[in-house]
């Protein structure tokens, strides 16, 4: 009986010590904030926003042109012969189909570009973070998105932002 209590006490003591020791080496980082607040990240966001706005303007212009053509064709419905109207309607339908394909293509290309830019950003900051954790003897860096609640003492986001801006 006495030895069981002793073993349980030792286990509790060891577990508490190991948890306390490991908690000191676990920190978290808000990657989104690093992207939004560093000069390199701001440049990436600015370029992506510019590309997105340009794409949206082109799509809107093409959509408006197609709507005008459709309205014009509707107004000419009674003037044109039935056969001529069908030919123009089919042509307009093909233009709408091409527009939809173009719209999908632009969206896919933008998503690819965005992913490439974000991957490049991660490749850029990864060695910086690795150097930081080596210097600070940190064992694990978690993404803030994956943490339910934690003390702000373990947040290294601001420090990483400063270091990335110095290296960027």
Predicted segments with their positions:
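Sec/Tat signal peptide C-region and signal peptidase I cleavage site
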Residues: 18-22
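Amphipathic alpha-helical segments
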Residues: 23-147, 164
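Bacterial N-terminal signal peptides
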Residues: 8-16
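Bacterial N-terminal signal peptides that target proteins for export
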Residues: 1-8
């Amino acid at each position: 009986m006495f030895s069981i209590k002793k073993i349980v006490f030792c286990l509790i003591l060891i577990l508490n010590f190991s948890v306390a020791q490991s908690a000191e080496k676990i920190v978290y980082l808000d990657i989104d904030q690093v992207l939004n607040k560093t000069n390199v990240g701001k440049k990436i966001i600015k370029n992506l926003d510019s590309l997105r706005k340009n794409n949206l303007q082109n799509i809107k212009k093409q959509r408006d042109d197609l709507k005008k053509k459709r309205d014009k064709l509707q107004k000419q419905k009674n003037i044109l012969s039935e056969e001529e109207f069908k030919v123009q309607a089919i042509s307009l339908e093909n233009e709408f189909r091409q527009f939809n394909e173009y719209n999908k293509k632009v969206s896919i290309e933008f998503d690819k570009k965005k992913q490439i830019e974000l991957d490049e950003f991660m490749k850029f900051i990864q060695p910086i973070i690795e150097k930081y954790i080596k210097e600070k003897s940190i064992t694990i860096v978690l993404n803030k998105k994956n943490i339910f609640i934690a003390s702000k003492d373990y947040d290294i986001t601001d420090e990483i932002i400063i270091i990335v801006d110095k290296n960027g």
